[in-house]
């Protein structure tokens, strides 16, 4: 099998990446098969069935074409792609396969963001949508996300069905396709019209509302991705021009040369933005990840000091400020079960109903669809990993609408001689100070997968837990879909889908553990209202030392 793949190396689109791999890395591409999981596909480049290349992309596309023809008589798909290596090439390969096998494809000629894709699926009434992106992963990654007709990512059941169709493609090296030029001439692959982009921009403008003043100054960065120029265009339309762009960090560039990883969850991502803010005396720095579904912010003060806000803190700001703006009598917040503990306390304090879902924004999208006819107003949907949604004209994380609204709130606070930090401190004074931390432990190769399983098996067996002076209350085991009262041993069913997640709830907050759905990583979530927060984190890490599990 390996020889057949090597014979087609020059056609694979990934020859230059293959040539940089070690022998072990090359072998790993043949030890596994890329699977379409509940989070889509995400991997590194290389040859073999376990890596991203022209042939594994075409295999996905043929399976997807057969899946679409099963659910629709006249399937139509819109594809968007980000600024990563091979994103455009992969989108064209998918378009060729889909078009050859009976699916109409809408294909833009330049990069677009994830929220634009989610919006376009609904706006154009397509059967499905595809986003080529690996979000904020390192530059040698790419991936595929699939969206249903509602604009949300595919849920578990349709994902499994699609996966079956993909698995039925047994000869990915010899899939016959028509050329793109012919498919375009026959109007099977059709161009993406600017009207959809204008409709999305109008939806964001309607959400945010025009600026009446512009005294606060903002630095914008796309981290070499897709949020610019659309975000700057929207701000101009909203009568806000008091911003500067960190141009060296906002040129589309697959290498992401100005950052280690293009991830606004990491504070050092803002180093260049801070320098520009100093030169420009700006008050706010906003950075979005490459596909513009996540964002981060840093606030700068008159004395030149700055404050970085983590994902939970941004959520608290949005929850409080949007609640005050809406003044709705019946409202709700949708969040993941690993989102910070204080968000639920704040929602309760503000009389906002809370809907908890599993990790993954597709579960938030599912709730949005279920609530379409509900009279309650959505205040905020968010995850701690810097993903937010204020209005469901998009059905995935939307850093563009969120950025515009945060800039508007910053301007309003400036008029009141207030800052985001002031708003957060008021919340802490009222409800207590919680600290949040998310750790990503990376495990490499097949051995790493075994280590992750070993750790999760350990947690799966626990009926109680001791960490410092924390008082354990409940263990929520989403693997078993059981919630256990630590004191009484009483068990109850968790009314959410099964997931590889265990959450330890204490009187002081929670600690949760789960493997990543897209990468060989273990994620640990800490959200606690304690003085010795770092001590608790260190003790927990010592206790799960993989050599002693």
Label each PLM-derived region with a short phrase.
Residues 2-94, 101, 182-183, 187-218, ...:
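An N-terminal, well-structured beta->alpha segment
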Residues 25-34, 142-271:
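Gly/Ser/Thr-enriched, mixed-charge loops and adjacent short helices
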Residues 30-50, 135, 222-230, 234, ...:
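Conserved phosphate/anionic-ligand binding catalytic regions in large, soluble enzymes, centered on
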Residues 78-141, 234, 241-297:
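N-terminal small/polar loop signature for handling phosphorylated ligands or for N-terminal nucleophile
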Residues 88-93, 118-121, 140-146, 229-234, ...:
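Short acidic, glycine/serine/threonine-rich loops at helix termini
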Residues 278, 282-284, 305, 325, ...:
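Phosphate-binding and adjacent anionic-ligand microenvironments
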């Amino acid at each position: 099998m390996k020889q057949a793949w090597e014979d087609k190396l020059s056609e694979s689109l990934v020859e230059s990446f293959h040539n940089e791999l070690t022998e072990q890395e090359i072998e790993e591409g043949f030890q596994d098969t890329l699977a379409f999981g509940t989070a889509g596909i995400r991997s590194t480049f290389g040859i073999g069935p376990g890596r991203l290349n022209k042939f594994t992309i075409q295999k996905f596309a043929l399976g997807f074409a057969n899946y679409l023809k099963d659910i629709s008589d006249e399937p139509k798909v819109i594809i968007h792609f980000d600024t990563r290596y091979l994103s455009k090439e992969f989108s064209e390969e998918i378009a060729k396969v889909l078009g050859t096998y009976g699916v109409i494809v809408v294909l833009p000629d330049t990069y677009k963001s994830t929220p634009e894709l989610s919006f376009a699926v609904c706006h154009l009434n397509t059967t499905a949508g595809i986003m080529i992106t690996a979000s904020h992963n390192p530059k040698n990654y790419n991936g595929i996300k699939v969206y249903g007709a509602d604009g949300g990512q595919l849920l578990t059941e349709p994902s499994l069905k699609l996966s079956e169709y993909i698995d039925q493609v047994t000869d990915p090296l010899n899939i016959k396709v028509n050329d793109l030029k012919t498919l375009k001439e026959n109007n099977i692959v059709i161009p993406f019209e600017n009207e959809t982009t204008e409709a999305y921009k109008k939806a964001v403008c309607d959400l945010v509302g025009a600026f009446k003043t512009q005294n606060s100054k903002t630095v914008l960065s796309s981290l070499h991705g897709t949020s610019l120029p659309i975000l700057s265009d929207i701000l101009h339309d909203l009568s806000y021009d008091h911003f500067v762009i960190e141009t060296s960090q906002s040129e589309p560039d697959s290498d992401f040369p100005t950052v280690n990883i293009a991830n606004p969850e990491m504070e050092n991502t803002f180093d260049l933005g801070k320098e520009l803010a100093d030169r420009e005396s700006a008050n706010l720095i906003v950075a979005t990840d490459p596909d513009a579904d996540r964002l981060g912010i840093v606030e700068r003060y008159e004395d030149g000091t700055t404050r970085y806000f983590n994902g939970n803190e941004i959520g608290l700001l949005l929850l409080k400020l949007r609640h005050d703006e809406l003044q709705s009598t019946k409202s709700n917040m949708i969040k993941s079960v690993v989102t910070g503990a204080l968000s639920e306390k704040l929602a309760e304090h503000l009389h906002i109903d809370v809907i908890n879902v599993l990790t993954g924004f597709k579960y938030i999208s599912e709730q949005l669809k279920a609530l379409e006819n509900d009279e309650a107003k959505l205040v905020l949907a968010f995850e701690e990993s810097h993903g937010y949604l204020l209005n469901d004209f998009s059905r995935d994380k939307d850093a563009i609408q969120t950025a515009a609204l945060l800039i508007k709130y910053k301007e309003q606070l400036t008029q009141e001689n207030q800052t985001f930090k002031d708003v957060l401190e008021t919340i802490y004074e009222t409800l207590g100070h919680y600290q949040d931390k998310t750790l990503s432990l990376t495990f490499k190769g097949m051995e790493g997968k075994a280590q992750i399983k070993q750790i999760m098996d350990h947690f799966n067996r626990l009926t109680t837990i001791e960490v410092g002076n924390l008082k354990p209350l409940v263990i929520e085991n989403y693997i078993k879909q059981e919630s256990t009262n630590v004191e009484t041993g009483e068990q109850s069913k968790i009314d959410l889908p099964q997931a590889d997640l265990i959450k330890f709830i204490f009187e002081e907050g929670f600690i949760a553990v789960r493997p990543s759905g897209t990468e060989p990583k273990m994620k640990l979530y800490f959200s606690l209202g304690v003085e010795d927060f770092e001590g608790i984190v260190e003790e927990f890490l010592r206790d799960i030392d993989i050599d002693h599990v």
